[in-house]
Amino acid sequence: MKKNIFTALIISTTAFILVSCGGQDEIYKEWIKEGGYDYPAKAINMTSLQGYQKVTLMWEKPMDPAVKRAILYWDNYAKSRDVNYDDFADGKVTIVVDSLEDRSYTFDVVNFDADENKSLPAELTVSPYGDSWLISRSERTVVSAIMDGDDAKIEMTKATDEMVATRFRYKDATGAWVDFKTLLKPGTNEITLPGALKGKRFEYSSAFCPSYGRDTVWRPWTISNDGISYKINASRWNVTVTTNQVFSENTPDKIIDGKVASASRWHSSRSDGLKNIFPKILSIDTGASPGEEFAFTKFVFYEHPSIVSMRYIKNYVMFVGSSPYDPNADDYANTFGIPFLSGIMSTANPTSEVVASTGATGRYIAIVFPNSWSSDGYIDLWELEPYGYIPSQAD
């Protein structure tokens, strides 16, 4: 009896297994091909070049004549492009994929033969560069732009990472725009714009290319903050100075007469009771009408041309504004507003240039001397040359 039961169980189990296996065969039958699949040759030696919003993909054309075409997939197979190998006679396939974003893409190449058998995919991940990358590149800025005769001398900040060149365009003497052909290279920061129109703003744009990239990309044009400065004729300006700070005929109006001469300079008081009084303040009225005020970008101070010990200017503070400055103000630091320029001058040279990164606009100027290199408290200014432009006429 036990033997019959055992035999029956074996027969039932065997039948169940046979039925189950038969069901599994039906499930996987569509994925199984008698004799196995034929896989055409896979794409080999797949490489890339990264460009601006694009990549260039390259691989070897299959040597198997049965392989006639391929499909290039990217974006997780959401996008594709057909590749006909007959279009590439030299044995090298080159495909450019553009309109890409700043991110990584995985590209797959699948080959097909005449019977539509497909190869295993050849895969390559590439990261093009685009607008996000370009925005992160820093543009140069203008250090100074000043007329030198009929030309403009432009000084820029140094080149930044991945910068390959900077181009310029400007207005000439006729008011026409000039696209200057000479490029400013990364190793230099000065350029001359021939025949530039003084007082006008100019434009510049730099090109960038990463070390791994093949495309050079130009940033949009940047308009200079200031116009091209020039030496201003200040002969009609009015200059006053702190009361009693004049020696003999050396009056303050002579610092803007265009002459660098001993008989044409301002010298502060030499009187024992007055010479060490500070601050000594020059107050200047340019007389400019509203809307025609200058934006000042540079001043050149002339002191004694030959005797070092007679160059007295030490610290200076300059202000530019729309209201007159009191030359007798004791509390200038709290009443004159924000200083435009300040610093300390050396006695090494007879001239000292004071340059602003951005021009300051106003009718009135104050130059404050809070001290002197001289123990006697002297200030001896032979000439003051102002440079600037009129903002309302700069475009």
Where are these regions (language model features)?
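Beta-strand-rich modules
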Residues: I95-L124, T192-N225
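Trp- and acidic/polar-enriched beta-sheet ligand-binding modules for extracellular glycan
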Residues: I277-F278, I307-D395
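Recognizes extended acidic, P/S/T-rich segments that occur
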Residues: R69-R103, A114, R169-G199, P339-M345
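A short beta-strand element within beta-rich, extracytoplasmic domains
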Residues: E293-I307, I367
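C-terminal motif of bacterial Sec signal peptides marking the signal peptidase cleavage site
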Residues: I17-S20
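Pro/Thr/Ser/Gly-rich low-complexity, intrinsically disordered linker/stalk tracts
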Residues: G22-P65, L120-D161, V217-W237, Y387-S392
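Solvent-exposed loop/turn segments flanking beta-strands in beta-repeat/beta-sandwich domains
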Residues: V55-T56, K61-K79, E155-F180, M310-N315
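Disordered, acidic Ser/Thr/Pro-rich linker "stalks" and the adjacent N-terminal cap
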Residues: T222-G287, V308-M310, S392-D395
